[in-house]
From Swiss-Prot:
Keyword Cell membrane listed: no
E.C. code: 3.1.3.11
Residue sites binding Mg(2+) 2 per the record: 116, 119, 282
Keyword field: Carbohydrate metabolism, Cytoplasm, Hydrolase, Magnesium, Metal-binding
Pfam short name (any one): FBPase
PANTHER family for the chain: FRUCTOSE-1,6-BISPHOSPHATASE-RELATED (PTHR11556), SEDOHEPTULOSE-1,7-BISPHOSPHATASE, CHLOROPLASTIC (PTHR11556:SF35)
Name used for this protein in its record: Fructose-1,6-bisphosphatase class 1
Cofactor requirement: Mg(2+)
Assembly and binders: Homotetramer.
Catalytic activity: beta-D-fructose 1,6-bisphosphate + H2O = beta-D-fructose 6-phosphate + phosphate
GO biological process: fructose 1,6-bisphosphate metabolic process; fructose 6-phosphate metabolic process; fructose metabolic process; gluconeogenesis; sucrose biosynthetic process
Gene Ontology MF terms: fructose 1,6-bisphosphate 1-phosphatase activity; magnesium ion binding
Binding site for Mg(2+) 1: 94, 116, 118
Length: 338
């Protein structure tokens, strides 16, 4: 009987280390630890009501958002998995107001890990796909991290990825050499390579936006969406479909597989706080992944990966996905400025 040879995440990373010589061993180990933590989160998510982890925790995070029990548990899983391995100088999370330095009793490394432990957690109780998003940076101060150490533009990321906890659990990764997708084989507990070198089509007929906010949009976004909604009779001459899951990982994963544009723009409700999504652990890693897959990502006025962070929890407008559509929206913003 022949054995089916499959490429696991560990094998893939080791091969990348040998072939490209730009994947250091400690970065490889860090990615494997994050992936292992995502397996633990997936297990807890899948238990649902049986695991007594649904519902709110009776607390709020630094953004003033009500924390779900699984938000807190997922954050603890990632901290516990990564604090002792010697690969990190510090971590930062959506669920923590300030950064988490590696305790003095553990060895420290040269990387910084930033993550949203459970993106889309408002969907937990209704069994919609949710996920984990992460970004890896080098610590510019060696092994002594400060909050300033984290405030690097997205172009400085050395790795980024996300896990989706849905019908299958998948782990999507880039180290700056394309985008690959691994599916969790629950029988043996391994991440198995199932999609290589993912590419986002440059054109699309699908868009993702929360249309209930239409009355608050600025003119460039309103103009773009009005054109799409006009369909074949409008200026675009074709029909478009809207898809909105309200879970960034799920929406972006769909776009990564079949194209589309995802939009969470700034609007008139909070002119002093542009956008809702966080730059460091949502917009930057997703933009890195999307660009590596041939797509584009912008705030409307600037490439997201070029934005200089001013704080760990800074928010930005996010428009990403199929390149030609993203560039069209950016063009409308430029025209509105002139």
């Amino acid at each position: 009987m022949s054995i089916t040879r499959r490429t696991t995440l560990s094998k893939y990373l080791i091969e990348q280390q040998r072939e490209t010589h730009n994947l250091p061993a400690d970065l490889r180990l860090l990615i494997e630890v994050v992936a292992r933590a995502c397996k633990a989160i997936s297990y807890n998510v899948s238990k649902g009501a049986l695991g007594d982890a649904l519902g709110t925790a009776g607390s709020e995070n630094v953004q003033g958002e009500v924390q779900k029990k699984l938000d807190i548990l997922s954050n603890e899983i990632l901290l516990d998995a990564n604090e002792w391995g010697g690969n990190l100088a510090a971590m930062a999370s959506e669920e923590m107001e300030t950064f988490f330095p590696i305790p003095a009793n553990y060895p420290r490394g040269e990387y910084l890990l930033v993550f949203d432990p459970l993106d889309g957690s408002s969907n937990i109780d209704v069994n919609v796909s949710i996920g984990t998003i992460f970004s890896v940076l080098r610590c510019p101060d060696g092994q002594q991290a400060t909050e300033q150490s984290f405030l690097q533009p997205g172009t400085e990321q050395v790795a980024a990825g996300y896990a989706v906890y849905g019908p299958q659990t998948v782990f999507v990764l880039t180290t700056g050499n394309g985008v690959n997708c691994f599916t969790l084989d629950r029988e043996v507990g391994s991440w198995v390579l199932t999609q290589s070198n993912l590419r986002i089509p440059e054109d699309t007929r699908e868009y993702a936006i929360n249309a209930s906010n239409a009355r608050h949009w600025y003119e460039p976004v309103k103009r773009y969406i009005d054109e799409l909604n006009a369909g074949a009779e409008g200026p675009r001459g074709e029909n478009f479909n809207m898809r909105w899951i309200a879970s960034m990982v799920a929406d972006v994963h769909r776009i990564l597989n079949r194209g589309g544009i995802f939009m969470y723009p700034a609007d008139k409700r909070t002119p002093d706080r542009p956008g809702k999504l966080r730059l460091m652990y949502e917009a930057n890693p997703m933009s890195f992944i999307v660009e590596q897959a041939g797509g584009a990502a912008t705030t409307g006025l600037k490439r997201i990966l070029d934005v200089q962070p001013t704080g760990l929890h800074q928010r930005v407008p996010v428009i990403l996905g199929s390149k030609n559509e993203v560039e069209r929206v950016a063009r409308y913003h430029e025209q509105a400025q002139s």
